[in-house]
C-alpha cells in the first residue's frame, strides 16, 4: 500500500523553482533515500513533503488523505519525518536518546519502534 505520495511537486525559493513536476511515492514501512549532488533539490523535495516549504504546484497525499495545506507540526504527528543531510543530532546524547527526541510528539510507546530501528541498523 502506498502511504505517501507527492504529485507534480513544484517549489522553490524567491520565485525561482528548484524542483519542477516531481512525482514520488513511498509504501508503508519503506525507508526511502533521495540521493543527488549539491543543489539538486533533495532538501527542497523533503521540505515540500513536510510542509516546511509551500508548493507552487502539486499535492501531497498521506494514507489517502490530502495534506497539502496541513501544517508541518500536524504532519509530524501523523508520523511523517526525515533525516536531513546536515548533522542535526545532539552530539552529547546517545543514538537512543536522539531517537527518543525525534519521537517526542508521538502518543504511543516508542520503545518498539526503537527496537525495530536497532534490528534494521544493528551497528547502532
Placement of each model-derived feature along the sequence:
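ABC-type ATPase nucleotide-binding domains, specifically the catalytic core motifs of the NBD
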Residues: 14, 32, 93-112, 120-123
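Short coil-to-beta microelement around the adenine-binding A-loop and adjacent beta1/P-loop entry
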Residues: 16-17, 74
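Short beta-strand immediately N-terminal to the Walker A/P-loop
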Residues: 32-33, 82
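Conserved Walker
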Residues: 43-44
Amino acid at each position: 500500500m502506498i502511504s505517501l505520495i507527492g504529485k507534480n511537486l513544484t517549489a522553490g525559493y524567491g520565485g525561482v523553482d528548484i524542483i519542477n513536476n516531481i512525482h514520488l511515492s513511498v509504501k508503508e514501512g519503506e525507508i526511502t533515500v533521495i540521493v543527488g549532488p549539491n543543489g539538486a533539490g533533495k532538501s527542497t523535495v523533503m521540505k515540500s513533503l513536510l510542509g516546511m516549504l509551500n508548493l507552487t504546484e502539486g499535492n501531497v497525499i498521506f494514507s489517502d488523505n490530502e495534506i497539502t495545506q496541513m501544517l508541518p507540526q500536524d504532519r509530524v504527528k501523523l508520523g511523517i519525518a526525515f533525516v536531513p543531510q546536515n548533522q542535526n543530532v545532539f552530539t552529547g546524547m546517545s543514538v537512543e536518546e536522539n531517537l527518543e527526541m525525534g519521537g517526542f510528539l508521538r502518543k504511543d510507546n516508542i520503545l518498539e519502534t526503537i527496537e525495530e530501528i536497532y534490528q534494521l541498523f544493528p551497528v547502532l
